[in-house]
């Protein structure tokens, strides 16, 4: 039993360390992108013209445009609904959010030239179709998949606890019966001989 707990502890430590190692390696901020050195931190184009034309007094022209801020009135009654909202969007709106491709325009044109006319006309990306997206509530336990995972984890934990209790009771009973090997040697039958029960009086 002691070995099982030690083994379980080692497995748990290995899982936690693997999880933290995966988080560290997946972090995009650790490595610089070699393709975009100009966008990297601390690398700026050299422009000496701005330094020579400034007076240093701070009274120069203000080349910045004023920032515009917009505000919306906040509704007085907060919206509280437990039902998720359904928002309709079209594929063209979703495709506007897709990041730009890394192919050059010449490669894209070459691919379009090689496509037959029947495939070009029936491109599903160009058609507007309705897509329903469900907005999830802010509360974590109101989401069905999280609630199902918590319930399943609770049931498995409860069954595991019952299993451990039953195993403990079984071992205690077996130990009380005497058939449980405790590592002690039983004395041989020749070691203890029964004394004669007859008494002789002189």
Curated annotation (Swiss-Prot):
- For region Disordered, the annotated ranges are 41-130, 179-202
Residues of the signal peptide = 1-22
Q: Which residues lie on this side of the membrane: Extracellular?
A: 23-148
What membrane topology was assigned to this protein in its record? Single-pass type I membrane protein
Q: Ranges of Basic and acidic residues compositional bias? A: 104-124
Chief subcellular location equals membrane
Polar residues compositional bias, start-end: 79-93
Give the stretches traversing the membrane.
149-169
Which Pfam families does the entry mention? Syndecan
Q: Which InterPro entries match?
A: Neurexin-like, Syndecan, Syndecan/Neurexin_dom, Syndecan_CS
Cite the position(s) of the site with description Cleavage of ectodomain. 143-144
Q: Name one GO cellular component term.
A: membrane
A GO biological process held by the record: cell migration
After translation, the protein is modified as follows: O-glycosylated; contains both heparan sulfate and chondroitin sulfate.
Where located?
Membrane
Q: In the record, which positions carry Phosphoserine?
A: 188
Which PROSITE patterns has this protein been placed in?
SYNDECAN
Family stated for the protein in its record:
Belongs to the syndecan proteoglycan family.
Q: How does it assemble?
A: Interacts (via cytoplasmic domain) with SARM1. Forms a complex with SDCBP and PDCD6IP.
Please explain the role this protein plays, according to its UniProt record.
Cell surface proteoglycan which regulates dendritic arbor morphogenesis.
Protein name as it appears in the record: Syndecan-2
**From which source organism is this entry?**
Bos taurus
The gene coding this protein: SDC2
